[in-house]
């Protein structure tokens, strides 16, 4: 009997898929690296199992890192196993090559990296053929509840639908390699021009991030403190006393980043304002107008990390770990590793159901 191999991105997701499918697909037997039922085999990666590399003839050794050997642009990219997960890769490839497995389902995370993880595994398993040649479908999950998983299996996407995302993922991976290899070798050659070997790594994300840190550090070192003055006062009103602070209503931003509407640079200016208003009557007008404010967009990962850092002091890594746990273990969030701040249109019924559940919970 032919079977379908489902490849998830991590073991916990594979277990969730098995739990969700059991009521409709029957009992699954558990083995060391996979689950199997009458119709399905479910296994998982543990993140990236395969990485790209240049063909061996393009691998310039350290002693030849010079501008004369740049740029390195191989005509193709080969694949190699990630060292620490070789055994896992072998287990997944073994299931993919089974003769009774006639089609594959990519159940890796719903994003560019999830697409790449599966594609590289499938390509590696196919060897020189560049793939196994078996039909592929995509399980696209925004939520990890059992019903959401079953709905996902009822609405599998075709391989052709995912080709654009797969191309984007592969392009990003290969571009990162080209930037990293050529940039690192060029900067290392430049910094080693007077002798020795001074490894200077370059990366698409690493280098701009390092630049931000350096720029900030330079501003901190160049900062010179300046005294400024504020005018604070207590006001007596019919309803009682309240505190207030002077500000310049005509203030406009300038090239001076330290200038603010409530700051004065001269003590005599502050004293003059205080003397002019001390003990003087004044009229205060309070106005309120109705306004309509649109609700904020949903969080993407970056905005969630920024909010959690500002409110709770969480690092980006801590926020991601918490969000991932709420998504995978507690089924309380949609997929967190997203750069989108909107849900797909077909998610409207689920959103309504969630709001009804929250309303009934008394939260």
Which residues does each predicted region cover?
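A generic secondary-structure signal for well-formed alpha-helical elements
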Residues: 21-25, 124-129, 157, 182, ...
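Extended, highly charged linker/hinge segments and catalytic-adjacent loops that couple domains
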Residues: 162, 166-167, 176-178, 182, ...
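Long, highly charged, low-complexity internal segments
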Residues: 39-41, 49-82, 94, 197-328, ...
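Flexible glycine-/small-residue-rich
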Residues: 8-9, 44-46, 108, 179, ...
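Short, surface-exposed helix-loop/turn micro-motifs enriched in polar/charged residues
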Residues: 109, 113, 131, 137, ...
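C-terminal or mid-to-C-terminal helical accessory/interaction module adjacent to the motor/catalytic core
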Residues: 77, 90, 98-99, 144-235, ...
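Intrinsically disordered, low-complexity regulatory segments
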Residues: 1-173, 177-181, 257, 261, ...
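Conserved short loop/turn motifs at secondary-structure junctions
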Residues: 2-3, 105-110, 194-199, 288-296, ...
């Amino acid at each position: 009997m032919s079977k379908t191999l489902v490849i998830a991105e991590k073991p916990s997701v594979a277990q969730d898929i098995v739990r969700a499918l059991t009521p409709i697909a029957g009992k699954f037997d558990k083995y060391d690296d996979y689950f199997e039922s009458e119709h399905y085999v479910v296994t998982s990666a543990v993140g990236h199992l395969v990485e790209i590399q240049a063909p061996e003839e393009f691998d310039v050794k350290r002693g030849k890192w010079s501008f004369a050997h740049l740029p390195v642009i191989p005509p193709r990219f080969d694949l190699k196993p990630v060292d620490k997960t070789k055994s896992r890769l072998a287990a997944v490839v073994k299931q993919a090559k089974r003769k009774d497995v006639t089609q594959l389902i990519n159940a890796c995370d719903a994003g560019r990296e999830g697409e790449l993880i599966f594609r590289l595994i499938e390509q590696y398993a196919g060897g020189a053929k560049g793939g196994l040649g078996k039909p592929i479908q995509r399980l696209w999950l925004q939520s990890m509840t059992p019903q959401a998983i079953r709905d996902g299996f009822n609405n599998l996407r075709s391989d052709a639908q995912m080709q654009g995302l797969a191309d984007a993922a592969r392009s990003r991976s290969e571009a990162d390699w080209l930037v990293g290899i050529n940039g690192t070798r060029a900067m290392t050659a430049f910094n080693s021009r007077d002798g020795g070997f001074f490894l200077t790594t370059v990366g698409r994300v690493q280098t701009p991030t390092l630049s931000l840190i350096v720029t900030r550090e330079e501003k901190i070192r160049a900062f010179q403190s300046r005294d400024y003055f504020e005018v604070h006062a207590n006001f007596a009103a019919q309803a009682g006393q309240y505190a207030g602070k002077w500000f310049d209503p005509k203030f406009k931003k300038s090239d001076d980043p330290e200038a603010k509407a409530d700051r004065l640079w001269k003590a005599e200016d502050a004293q003059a304002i205080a003397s002019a208003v001390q003990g003087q009557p004044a009229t205060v007008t309070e106005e309120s107008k109705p306004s309509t404010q649109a609700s904020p967009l949903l969080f993407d990962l970056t905005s969630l990390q920024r909010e959690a850092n500002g409110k709770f002091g969480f690092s980006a890594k801590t926020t991601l770990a918490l969000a991932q746990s709420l998504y995978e273990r507690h089924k309380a969030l949609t997929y967190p590793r997203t750069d989108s701040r909107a849900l797909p249109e077909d998610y409207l019924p689920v959103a309504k159901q969630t709001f009804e559940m929250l309303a009934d919970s008394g939260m």
